Design a protein with these regions (language model features):
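Multi-pass alpha-helical membrane architecture of UbiA-family
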Residues: 1-185
Length: 185
């Protein structure tokens, strides 16, 4: 576990000093670093739970969309700073198409997770995610202003917060089963 965290901290340093300016790697690594502490749990307890992997995949795509919207909003600043972000290299229209693809994947995951796993009341968060991501995809199609990017970023940040809070509504029986499975030697 110590080696994992040494690698994690080193990767954060590399990201902040070198990688964040690179095409594609900066965006992917930013989202991955936010989700990778979940991998520490798998490493420590030596058990991989498909439900948690599903949550991590959902969060990764959500954060990747957040990074892309931030890059769209900061396009002029990133150009003057010499960054090679996805919107700079591929252009605004292709980045918006990639975002619509990410929102489509998030919509599919929002449908799949409650159907595959018993989430209890947390399933309502994922059911509500479907119209939310459809709304964002349509808004992305219609609006191209800096203000719309700011609005989307705020909505996505609120959605991440709501997702985190919705964990409280996960089926407690299921949580106890996971706890027993993970914490038994």
């Amino acid at each position: 576990a110590a080696l994992y965290f040494v690698g994690y901290i080193t990767t954060i340093w590399l990201y902040s000093h070198r990688i964040r300016t690179l095409f594609l790697w900066g965006s992917l690594l930013s989202a991955f670093l936010a989700v990778s502490p979940i991998a520490a749990l798998f490493l420590y307890y030596r058990h991989v739970e498909p439900l948690i992997l599903g949550f991590a995949g959902f969060l990764f795509l959500l954060l990747l969309a957040l990074v892309q919207i931030k890059d769209l909003h900061n396009l002029r600043g990133d150009i003057s700073a010499g960054f090679k972000t996805i919107p700079i290299v591929l252009g605004e229209s292709k980045t918006r198409m990639i975002l619509r693809l990410i929102f489509s994947c998030l919509s599919l995951i929002s449908i799949a997770l409650p159907l595959v796993f018993d989430l209890g009341l947390m399933a309502y968060y994922f059911w509500a995610s479907l119209p939310f991501f459809v709304f964002l995809a349509i808004d992305l199609w219609i609006n191209r202003s800096s203000l719309s990017y700011i609005k989307m970023r705020m909505l996505l940040k609120i959605w991440v917060l709501l997702g985190t809070l919705s964990i409280l509504f996960l089926d407690f029986e299921r949580l106890n089963q996971l706890k027993a499975l993970i914490f038994t030697p």
